[in-house]
Structure formats: C-alpha cells, structure tokens
Amino acid sequence: MRVVMCILIISFTVIFGMSCERHMEQQVSYTEADSLNHLAYDMRYKDLSVAMKAAKRACQLAEGNSDLRAEALNNMGFCAFMRMDFEKASSLYLQALKEGGNEIEHLISDVGMMKICQRTSMNKEFYDYRNSALQRLKRIREDEALISDTHEKQRLNYAVSEFHIVSGIYFYYLEQHDESLRSINSITPDVLQGDTAQWLYYEYMRGSGGMYEAPTREEITIGE
C-alpha cells in the first residue's frame, strides 16, 4: 500500500511540475506576443515588412489568448490594407472579429472594414460596419471608467481617432462637408496624446482632405 501511495505522490508531483512548466512557457509566449504587438503598431508607418513580421509572430505566440490574437490580426490587417491588398486585409479583420469578446479590438476591426469599404466603394457595407462600430463604442463608453490598463486606453484612443478620421474622409468625398467637419472635429487633442504617428496621420488627413475649419479662406489655406 505504501509503495502504491509513493508512486501516486511521485506521479502527481511530476504531472503538477509539468503543468506549471507549460503554464510558465505559455506566459512567456504571451509576454513576447504583447511586445511584438507593440512593435507592429509602432512600425506601421515606418516599415511595413517589420510590422507585418512582428504581427504574424505575435499571432502565433498568442495561441489560446484571444485578446492578443485579435490585436495581432488587426495589426496584420492594417499592413495588408496599406499594401492595398484589400482582400487579405478584409480576411484578417473578419478573423479578428471572431476572436473572443474584446470590444476595443473588435471596434478596430469594424473601423478597418470601414476603410476597406470606403476604398472599394461598398457604400451599404460601409454603413453596416459604421453602425456596428457606433454600437460597440456606446457599450465601451458605458464601462470606460473600468478601463485601467494603459495599453487598452491607447488602443481605444486609436480606435476612436481612426473611426472619426475614416468617417470624415467618407463624408468629405460624398460632399457632405458639415458632417465631415463634425466627424473630424470630434477628435480631441488628449485622444492622440502620446501617439505621434497617429497625430501626424490625423493632421495630414485633416489638411490634405480639406477638413480644416477657420474664419477666413486665407487661414484655411495656411492651416491646410
């Protein structure tokens, strides 16, 4: 009986140790995936190849973590969009929408699909994804006070700024100038604080897209 008990104890100890080791390895992978997601985002306007490579690796390492995978897929979708591979970008954003229940990442996916629909003249689908994004944003705002993670806040600010920029551009090309200005002016400076690349993108689109407002024509020209 004692021999059996000893065998059981040893077996349990070995199994428990292996389980702990696997858990630790998984956590190391998730930490690396998180760092790679940050790198992919930071490099998105500097080097698309580096950004895509980092996002792909993050997606692999994030197996079992839907939040990290959704973020990686969104980063990959952005890179594909920038390369004008709209079919690939669409596939990645739609895949991200199926990952878990992270409303912030799903909001980013919706906005990514809005950009694709705008570029491919899919007007009905644009409004479908825009309405979905508005509903998500409403739900997020209801619980926004509970968001304490700095990275989550940054992702939300990115999503919100992208939503208003994309909407502003869309309405501008439809010659709905009041709606376009209303959308672009919804972006407040604090939303882009700490995200230089996104702030520059916002300023560029605002100026080049004719979404700058000022009292006189001369001031508008200077501002743009």
Region annotations inferred by a language model:
Residues 45-46, 76, 83, 120, ...:
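Structural motif corresponding to the intra-repeat A-B loop/turn of tetratricopeptide repeats
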Residues 6-15:
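Bacterial N-terminal signal peptides
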Residues 27, 34-35, 71, 108-110, ...:
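Residue register of alpha-helical TPR repeats
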Residues 56-60, 94-98, 131-149, 181-192, ...:
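Amphipathic alpha-helical segments of tetratricopeptide repeats
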Residues 20-71, 87, 102-103:
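N-terminal leader/linker segments that initiate helical-solenoid repeat arrays
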